[in-house]
């Protein structure tokens, strides 16, 4: 039998941290932010409360890390289809629609984000960290948008910042509407594509 690998201190801590994040995501999604305690997360991960606090400042920080990791993972899932779509704007928008329809059918992330924001809104430190996470998300959105826009549109286009802000804000609004059940994932995808097509046209005209 092969010898079991002995983890370094850093590897062991990274493993513990990931196990806590996985457990937190599972419980936050299943029970909601408010109903999930750190004790429950620690138990689900097979760890102690001390392990939680040695990796995260508290429940708010743990939740924000879950949101940040899942948001970036979902955004990264769009990169491959966009690249595979080639230079066709219609194909790129079709890739966006398919991606949005998939994530729109799973409202857990947007619901958790809403719970986190309302719970920490009056906490200046957590609000600052949430804003920092949002800025990083928008930076990643910029990378994807620069790949998705029609050929010939420069990355430093004067309307690019506006396009990113509107894309993120519109996406958040549509995602919330889907979570509330006022529109379905297919309709949400169609609205996202329509919005992006308008911006693509504006970028082309103004280049």
Across the structure, where does each feature detected by a protein language model lie?
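Generic hydrophobic, amphipathic alpha-helix propensity
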Residues: 12-25, 41, 66-70, 74, ...
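Amphipathic alpha-helical segments used for helix-helix packing
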Residues: 91-92, 104-128, 176
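Amphipathic, non-transmembrane alpha-helical scaffold segments
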Residues: 13, 21, 67, 127-138, ...
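N-terminal intrinsically disordered/low-complexity leader segments
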Residues: 1-15, 149, 204-207
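Hydrophobic alpha-helical connector segments
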Residues: 65, 79-110, 155, 160-167, ...
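Helix-turn-helix
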Residues: 19, 23-61, 65
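Hydrophobic/aromatic-rich alpha-helical bundle segments in the mid-to-C-terminal region
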Residues: 127-131, 148-207
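Secondary-structure edge/capping motif, primarily at the C-terminal ends of alpha-helices
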Residues: 81, 85, 120-121, 178-182
